[in-house]
């Protein structure tokens, strides 16, 4: 750019074009590969789930969540890879806006969940009860629920009585499981032999009487309390989700403005070459079709 216009050069001009380009290529490629990996794992998990599932519902299926997440990451990251390789302003702007929208939506979702904390907890508890109804028919939910109940020493969603929603654990049901809870709710030492009937006839007990046999606290509150007690892990998790997206938006913005500066430099140079050269207005709309710099 001519010296007389140097004061108009944006701050991003201090960044090397090649440094920004290769940084964005590496950033996009890494998440493109991660998205492909997540998508592959999700497809494989869903194929395995289809072999053994007895329900048509995809409720709380981790495979479905992985597939959706993988598709979004794969497509968005591919746009970033293509845009950074081609220096295509339209694709670069689309990539930046998509990342920005995702980031804003996640922040808004988190804020709304905090503001309406009670409603969020009720929503989670209702969905857990729906899963409990099909506990023995949905292997994915069963594995997740068993892991959470053992890991966080809890039982059910709101509390242990949620297990009455299951047809086998309802107190009016026939069979040995009636009015009981799964053994993963039981209080036991790691050295004890697993007693799968340890939760026998506990749903109809009062909390004070049941708390010496099973974990009476619900898993929703148990998980929330664990996150609050381990706030460093929570902060690290949030940073791990939000920071890469923010860096992607910032890096893309810097690269877009750097490419625009180069386009402007070329336009000014072409204008000095003679009347037959393309002016800035002639090249202003070509950012979606052409690659810069030549």
Curated annotation (Swiss-Prot):
Topological domains on the Cytoplasmic side lie at 1-23, 84-94, 257-294
Extract the InterPro entries matched here: Tetraspanin/Peripherin, Tetraspanin_animals, Tetraspanin_EC2_sf
Q: Which keywords fit this entry according to its UniProt record?
A: Cell membrane, Disulfide bond, Endosome, Glycoprotein, Membrane, Transmembrane, Transmembrane helix
Disulfide bridges in this chain: 154-219, 155-185, 171-179, 186-198
Which segments cross the bilayer?
24-44, 63-83, 95-115, 236-256
Q: Which residues are glycosylated?
A: 118, 189, 230
What Gene3D superfamilies does this protein's entry cite? Tetraspanin
Q: Which residues lie on this side of the membrane: Extracellular?
A: 45-62, 116-235
An individual GO BP term = negative regulation of Notch signaling pathway
PTM comment: the record says:
Palmitoylated.
According to the UniProt record, one GO cellular component term is:
cytosol
Say yes or no: keyword Ligase present: no
Subcellular location as annotated: Cell membrane; Late endosome membrane
Q: What does this protein do?
A: Part of TspanC8 subgroup, composed of 6 members that interact with the transmembrane metalloprotease ADAM10. This interaction is required for ADAM10 exit from the endoplasmic reticulum and for enzymatic maturation and trafficking to the cell surface as well as substrate specificity. Different TspanC8/ADAM10 complexes have distinct substrates. Promotes ADAM10-mediated cleavage of CDH2. Negatively regulates ligand-induced Notch activity probably by regulating ADAM10 activity.
Describe the family membership recorded for this protein in Swiss-Prot or TrEMBL: Belongs to the tetraspanin (TM4SF) family.
Subunit comment for this entry? Interacts with ADAM10; the interaction influences ADAM10 substrate specificity, endocytosis and turnover.
Under which name does UniProt file this protein?
Answer: Tetraspanin-15
Per the UniProt record, the source organism is Mus musculus
């Amino acid at each position: 750019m001519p010296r007389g216009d140097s004061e108009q050069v944006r701050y991003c001009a201090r960044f090397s074009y090649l440094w920004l380009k290769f940084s964005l290529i590496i950033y996009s490629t890494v998440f493109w590969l991660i998205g492909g990996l997540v998508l592959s794992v999700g497809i494989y998990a869903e194929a395995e789930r289809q072999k053994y599932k007895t329900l048509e519902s995809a409720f709380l299926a981790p495979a479905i969540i992985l597939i959706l997440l993988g598709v979004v990451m794969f497509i968005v990251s591919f746009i970033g890879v293509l845009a950074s390789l081609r220096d295509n302003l339209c694709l670069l702007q689309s990539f930046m806006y998509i990342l920005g929208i995702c980031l804003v939506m996640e922040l808004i979702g988190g804020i709304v969940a905090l503001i309406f904390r009670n409603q969020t907890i009720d929503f989670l508890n209702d969905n857990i009860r729906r899963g409990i109804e099909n506990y023995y028919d949905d292997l994915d939910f069963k594995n997740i629920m068993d892991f959470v109940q053992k890991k966080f020493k809890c039982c059910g969603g709101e509390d242990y009585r949620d297990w009455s929603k299951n047809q086998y654990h309802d107190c009016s049901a026939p069979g040995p499981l009636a009015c009981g809870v799964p053994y993963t709710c039981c209080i036991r030492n790691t050295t004890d032999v697993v007693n799968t009937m340890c939760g026998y006839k506990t749903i109809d007990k009062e909390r004070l009487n049941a708390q010496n046999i099973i974990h009476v606290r619900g898993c929703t509150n148990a998980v929330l309390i664990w996150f609050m007690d381990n706030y460093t892990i929570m902060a690290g998790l949030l940073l791990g989700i939000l920071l890469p997206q923010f860096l992607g938006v910032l890096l893309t913005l810097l690269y877009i403005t750097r490419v625009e500066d180069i386009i402007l430099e070329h336009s000014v140079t072409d204008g000095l070459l003679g009347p037959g050269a393309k002016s800035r207005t002639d090249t202003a709309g070509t950012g979606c079709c052409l690659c810069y710099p030549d």
